């Protein structure tokens, strides 16, 4: 199999990570190359990120598959370069994935990436998350906004029985504490901090809130 020409081979996933990704690995390799070319050209990721596309971006997003099931509907808000939305669409081919992104330049990139990857399970909406009528079982985000704002945008889009999955970093607990005014309004839906990515030899911090 030929690997993406623009991603340094030294940064490719390990054999065990490749196996964990399953059949989606081939398309993820294509997506990595799209990010390394058009993503950099359009300023969606920095040139220095090319060597870290897999571990910092694609694998980081792929860890969310541990918290989702194939076939569940997904909304990715502030989708940007398709992280995690495009990654989840590849790894969960039976899930309808809606990417919400307000910037034209980014939606143009997402539209082209969708076409290049042949993703029939992706819908792209140009606009802000606030006021959208679409809903889903899972609402994801990554590096979009502080948790209090993020929950205000995400919660109306989550179907009953669904959940918010927000990829966060080392300050997840601090953000959760700062968002208490918002989380206190969610009644019987406590927020928890989850670590996922074990199958990918990663540790990814996710704030998870289920809508009961």
Where do the PLM segments sit?
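Conserved SAM-binding loop of SAM-dependent methyltransferases across substrates and taxa
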Residues: 81-94
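Helix-to-beta-strand junctions that scaffold the AdoMet/dcAdoMet cofactor pocket
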Residues: 92, 158-160
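Conserved beta-strand/loop positions that form the S-adenosyl-L-methionine
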Residues: 77-79
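Conserved SAM/SAH-binding loop
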Residues: 125-131, 144-145
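A short acidic, Gly/Pro-enriched loop at the edge of an enzyme's catalytic core
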Residues: 72, 130-138
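Short beta-strand element of Class I
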Residues: 94-100
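Class I SAM-dependent transferase core
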Residues: 1-75, 91, 105-122
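Active-site capping/gating segments
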Residues: 98, 171-212
């Amino acid at each position: 199999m030929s690997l993406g020409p623009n991603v340094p081979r030294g940064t490719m996933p390990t054999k065990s990570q490749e196996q964990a990704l399953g059949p989606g690995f081939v398309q993820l390799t294509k997506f990595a190359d799209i990010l390394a070319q058009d993503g950099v050209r359009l300023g969606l990721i920095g040139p220095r990120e090319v060597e870290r596309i897999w571990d910092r971006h694609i694998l980081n997003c792929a860890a969310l598959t541990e918290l989702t099931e194939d076939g569940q509907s997904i909304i990715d808000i502030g989708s940007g370069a398709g992280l995690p939305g495009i990654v989840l669409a590849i790894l969960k081919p039976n899930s309808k994935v809606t990417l919400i992104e307000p910037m034209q330049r980014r939606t143009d990139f997402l539209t082209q990436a969708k076409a290049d990857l042949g993703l029939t399970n992706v819908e792209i909406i140009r606009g802000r998350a606030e006021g959208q009528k679409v809903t889903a079982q899972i609402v994801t985000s990554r590096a979009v906004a502080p948790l209090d704002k993020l929950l205000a945008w995400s919660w109306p889009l989550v179907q009953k029985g669904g959940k918010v999955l927000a990829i966060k970093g080392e300050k997840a607990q601090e953000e959760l504490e700062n968002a208490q005014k918002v989380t206190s309004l969610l009644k019987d839906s406590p927020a928890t901090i989850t670590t996922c990515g074990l199958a990918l030899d990663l540790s990814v911090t996710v704030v998870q809130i289920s809508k009961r």
